[in-house]
Amino acid sequence: MHGLVIVDSNGEPLRDSIIWCDSRAVDIGNKAYEKLGEEKCMSRLLNSPGNFTASKLKWVKENEPDIYEKIYKYMLPGDYIAYKLTGEINTTRNGLSEGIIWDYKENKTADWLLDFYGINSSLTPEIVDNFSNQGSIHVNASEQTGLNVGVPITYRAGDQPNNALALNVFDDGEVAASGGTSGVIYSITNNINSKEPSRINHFAHVNYNDDNKSIGKLLCINGAGIQYRWLRNHSVGKSYEKMNEQASSISVGSDGISVIPFGNGAERMLNNKNIGTHICNINLNKHSHGHLFRSALEGIAFSFMYGMEILKNDNAAINVIRAGNDNLFRSEIFANTVSTLIGHEIEIYNTTGAFGAARASGVLNNDLNSFREKITKNDHVMTFLPLKNRSEYEDAYSRWKEDLQGILNNKK
């Protein structure tokens, strides 16, 4: 993903990896965005340099100059794993895009950003295609892993692009969604115009190539399943199944309760505001556990809808949503709410990112047709269709947005 590994000319790491969520380079990325300008960054990087790999490399140059002088190549963590297996140092366009080192306009490494940071572009590894023979297992790796010598490495990707691959999400208008502790909406587009430098990130999707500029628009929601888990942990003896059963007895809109589920830290889609969780409009003479359970599921679903509206306002089409058969998408209330509000179906697949990556290793030269057919035939579990009583969901969502806006206004 967006971390940094640096090695010397012997291929030995020069320091511990700086992982994706390490925030030490935030100020560096923000200053670069300010000096380089929004137009250049958004038209060519589709992102702010932010706290990503290039900015982390600049941090090493500024704070650990003796280490920086010894760098032979920088890599993403996934590139380093491939190197340890094959002995070959290389990367992909997809990986460079996740490090915000890819120029979409010129379709090459963003050497101008490296130049701005004072980083020699020769430190960038050789670029290989995402679906290609990227090296083979060598003897030492074979002894340590049990993999046979000569087994080729033919695929690599970050977690969200790979999750999208596992869910058969490749084309404009297709969306991969996940609803664990946090939520992720990953929408595919061929439109490289964006005005969202912070709320949305853009990465070259796994099938991005010279002939197919497939971009993944990534929006994260910190407060998702953690909200429902918190309710379960504070409801004595309740399982998710019992909670869902009680929630299903409550009408759409939870009789006026709104749960604003943003209690897992600052939310990027709220411009990094940390507003916490709010349970609004409780009537102590009327509302029950079932109301709380349903309003929590609806509140999380409404936050997904809020995120999708941000994506749609930034040139993303949303024609179908695909998700794994786990976590929040096992809840009919949650899935029906999202499907009905967005007006499109949600397809549920019995797969994981690990299965997707294993299958992708058999894809060469971007020939994805048979790969996609197998997913559709073998993994599809069910489809949630938009319900006919959409107005009830829209009324509840409108009330939720009003409650959210009131909280945001008070945070100014």
Regions found by a protein language model. Give the residues of each.
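A conserved helix-loop-beta module that forms one wall/lid of the active-site cleft
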Residues: 117-132
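Hydrophobic or amphipathic alpha-helical targeting/insertion segments
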Residues: 9-12, 31, 35
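Short beta-strand to alpha-helix junction loop
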Residues: 103-105, 130-134
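Carbohydrate-associated surface elements
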Residues: 22
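Active-site core segments that coordinate phosphate-bearing ligands/cofactors
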Residues: 26, 33-90, 95, 100-111, ...
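N-terminal cofactor/phosphate-binding cores enriched in small/glycine residues
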Residues: 1-5, 11
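Short, charged/polar, Gly/Pro-enriched secondary-structure boundary elements
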Residues: 12-14, 192
